UniProtKB/Swiss-Prot annotation:
Pfam families: Ribosomal_L27. This is Large ribosomal subunit protein bL27. The keyword Transcription does not apply. PANTHER family: LARGE RIBOSOMAL SUBUNIT PROTEIN BL27M, RIBOSOMAL PROTEIN L27. Belongs to the bacterial ribosomal protein bL27 family. GO terms for cellular component: cytosolic large ribosomal subunit. It comes from Vibrio cholerae serotype O1 (strain ATCC 39315 / El Tor Inaba N16961). SUPFAM superfamilies: Ribosomal L27 protein-like. The lineage of its organism: Bacteria, Pseudomonadati, Pseudomonadota, Gammaproteobacteria, Vibrionales. Residues 1-22 are annotated as: Disordered.
Length: 86
């Protein structure tokens, strides 16, 4: 009789589900009000003009327009703003 001994168990073999963070709309892209621009943990990017921030630090468009990324301020912070077509 062919026998194969049972394989041992392991305590490894699991990982957390990816959270799909990152920039969703890049510089120059057109957005509509309510579109998510960046999903992030903490404020890696800060909200500029016409951009709102959610309780999980998600940045979203408050008006229609084009996305603009800029670095400004004494601490070289990254800001995301929306340039409206007026």
């Amino acid at each position: 009789m062919a026998h194969k001994k049972a394989g041992g168990s392991t305590r490894n073999g699991r990982d957390s589900e990816s959270k799909r963070l990152g920039v969703k709309r890049f510089g120059g892209e057109s957005v509509l009000a309510g579109n998510i621009i960046v999903r992030q943990r903490g404020t890696k990017f800060h909200a500029g003009t016409n951009v709102g921030i959610g309780k999980d630090h998600t940045l979203f468009a408050l008006s229609d327009g084009k996305v603009k990324f800029e670095v400004k301020g004494p601490n070289n912070r990254k800001f995301v703003s929306i340039e409206t077509a007026e």
